[in-house]
């Protein structure tokens, strides 16, 4: 009976000590995986940030192109009637006194220089 108790106690002590070692190993393994996960998340975050910055740059570039184009669209083109006091002829055009058809409508037009 005594040998059974000693054997049981010995097995119990070995199981507990090995279990503690496994617990420590598991803890270390979890810490390593967490650190790897953090580095992976940092990498993914940086990659996403780069893509967003590229997208933002493209959008801002398109906005600036649109604003340049929209200014040009606001000017008055060739052969379009306009008021005498409205100096919005497009670049390369000049406002002249009405001639020919402008005389009948008493409108000013933008003509090429």
From Swiss-Prot:
GO MF entry, a single one: toxin activity
Region (Disordered) residue spans: 60-87
Keyword Disulfide bond: yes
Amino acid composition bias (Basic and acidic residues), ranges on this chain: 60-69
Signal peptide: 1-21
Free-text note regarding domains: The presence of a 'disulfide through disulfide knot' structurally defines this protein as a knottin.
Protein name: U11-theraphotoxin-Hhn1e
Organism of provenance: Cyriopagopus hainanus
Species lineage: Eukaryota, Metazoa, Ecdysozoa, Arthropoda, Chelicerata
């Amino acid at each position: 009976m005594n040998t059974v108790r000693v054997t049981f106690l010995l097995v119990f002590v070995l199981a507990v000590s090995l279990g503690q070692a496994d617990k420590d190993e598991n803890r270390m393994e979890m810490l390593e995986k967490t650190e790897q996960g953090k580095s992976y998340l940092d990498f993914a975050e940086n990659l996403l940030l780069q893509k967003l910055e590229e997208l933002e740059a493209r959008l801002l570039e398109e906005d600036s192109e649109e604003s340049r184009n929209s200014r040009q669209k606001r000017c008055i083109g060739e052969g379009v009637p306009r008021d005498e006091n409205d100096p919005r002829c497009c670049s390369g055009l000049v406002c002249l006194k009405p001639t020919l058809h402008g005389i009948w409508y008493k409108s000013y037009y933008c003509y090429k220089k």
